[in-house]
Amino acid sequence: MTTSDPNPKPIVEDAQPEQITATEELAGLLENPTNLEGKLADAEEEIILEGEDTQASLNWSVIVPALVIVLATVVWGIGFKDSFTNFASSALSAVVDNLGWAFILFGTVFVFFIVVIAASKFGTIRLGRIDEAPEFRTVSWISMMFAAGMGIGLMFYGTTEPLTFYRNGVPGHDEHNVGVAMSTTMFHWTLHPWAIYAIVGLAIAYSTFRVGRKQLLSSAFVPLIGEKGAEGWLGKLIDILAIIATVFGTACSLGLGALQIGAGLSAANIIEDPSDWTIVGIVSVLTLAFIFSAISGVGKGIQYLSNANMVLAALLAIFVFVVGPTVSILNLLPGSIGNYLSNFFQMAGRTAMSADGTAGEWLGSWTIFYWAWWISWSPFVGMFLARISRGRSIREFILGVLLVPAGVSTVWFSIFGGTAIVFEQNGESIWGDGAAEEQLFGLLHALPGGQIMGIIAMILLGTFFITSADSASTVMGTMSQHGQLEANKWVTAAWGVATAAIGLTLLLSGGDNALSNLQNVTIVAATPFLFVVIGLMFALVKDLSNDVIYLEYREQQRFNARLARERRVHNEHRKRELAAKRRRERKASGAGKRR
């Protein structure tokens, strides 16, 4: 294995036929800026993607430790349920008590970091060759990233979260406050999750398609730890943590989906009281479906399913909007956005010491859980975003990833959460016994034609999970094969089975507290990866700072500054010469008059 510069330049320029200074070269480029684009486009033809040339051999040093952890979790959770559940609860308490502040702080740091990157000169850099066109159409690109990023979460929490905050209140606020309920929900589901995904996705996309490294999370750390470090034990540890976070994050989604589909079957009177075997059956069907989708390839399976998801989700949202309290939803939407913006920093600063020290338990169940869930999803969502974003500029990537899903989430929660709150205000509560997985179907069945829409909702839950798990298993296959862009289908399928095993373990070991068990284990599994995402920020900035476009931009700025100084000096000399000339003319004129 050959070593290379830990900060490789993404573009290699040919030697110049004659020696000229950077200032002279930039002067010529300023006179004809199209020369710069042509020069960089020619040079970028030399980019070689290591991931495309790497043999599809299995990386056992990454696979074995990850599988050992998965198998140990399954054996522990199924064979010793009480011990496993107690450990998960104790570990959660330790994380929230000692590292809750880190989740809260860096969750918001990630948002500001990615916004600054988009607004900076880095935003013009393309994720690939300078003339490379995007691989997917914009509509398909948006639908794929949204379905992979949080589709099933919107289905599960879209109704129950705003209603819960409205009924029970939020630390530091009274109950029955619509503005606080909606703004807190938006805080959890708009900018913060997608900022995390954008950081991971951008780091991988730049490293892979711009610089030409392997499509591995560890490869994005080359600017910090060097090529040897990325290929050594530290790089392997990063990839192992990425796989573990992905398995548990996806398993949490599988668990939520299975619980809610079971509730839908009960609400439709298909199965009166879903048993553990019903849940096993649901998980098995979903697992087979997403494995089939994954092995069909990203260009086919995920794209088709994602487009279908968007159609079904739009149909469901339009139904609730039209048949439900339309005017109330329209009134709620701008108010929710205003409350979110005005209370952003107050919500971002909420810690265990808030509300006279009573907010800790609430944060562990909501904000910290969400931040951990997004972080656990970030390896596979980030890598998936990278795979579908080749050819787009950094600014286009960030704006698309950050704003479009955030806007859709805002509309979704306003429709479903707003409708649930209006029902509550009118004395037609859908709260039931407080089971979160039942409330979406309670809302739908309270509307005319809701029985049919309930069936569509169950189908949508399944397809949303399939797209998410499809992305996750494909990405885990890539990480298991040295960054191979097209992972072996059987490796992909194996990780799908492992994810299903973890999901069933968390559901069955939790018993009546299955949802809490899912949340607890997700937070614990995601904690190590928080520090990986923090490190990615530094690696990304160092990588971007060595991009030739940015370096040319800095050189151009220096040239412009030197040129401006020279102009000032020249103008000053010119002023002095003119002043001296006027003095001589006045002196000569005075001498002529005396004669």
Curated annotation (Swiss-Prot):
GO-annotated cellular components: plasma membrane
Region (Disordered): 570-595
Annotated effect of mutating R392K: Moderately decreased betaine transport
Cited Pfam families: BCCT
Effect in UniProt of substituting G149A: Decreases betaine transport. No effect on activation by increased osmolality
Activity control summary: Uptake is activated by hyperosmotic stress. Osmoresponsive activation is triggered by a change in the internal K(+) concentration. In addition, shows a pronounced chill stimulation, at temperatures around 10 degrees Celsius. Chill activation may be influenced by the membrane lipid composition. Uptake is completely abolished by the uncoupler CCCP, and to a different extent by the ionophores valinomycin and nigericin.
pH behavior: Optimum pH is 7.5-8.5.
Source superkingdom: Bacteria
Mutagenesis or variant effect for W377A: Abolishes betaine transport
Ligand binding (glycine betaine): I152, G153, S253, W373, W374, I375, S376, W377
Annotated effect of mutating G151A: Nearly abolishes betaine transport
Documented effect of changing F380A: Decreases betaine transport, but has no effect on affinity for glycine betaine
Residue ranges crossing the lipid bilayer per the database entry: 60-80, 99-119, 138-158, 186-206, 237-257, 277-296, 300-323, 366-386, 397-417, 452-476, 490-510, 521-541
Deletion phenotype: Mutant shows strongly decreased glycine betaine uptake.
Reported impact of G153D: Changes substrate specificity, giving rise to proton-coupled choline transport. Decreases sodium-dependent betaine transport
Name listed for the protein in its UniProt record: Glycine betaine transporter BetP
Native source species: Corynebacterium glutamicum (strain ATCC 13032 / DSM 20300 / JCM 1318 / BCRC 11384 / CCUG 27702 / LMG 3730 / NBRC 12168 / NCIMB 10025 / NRRL B-2784 / 534)
Phylogenetic lineage: Bacteria, Bacillati, Actinomycetota, Actinomycetes, Mycobacteriales
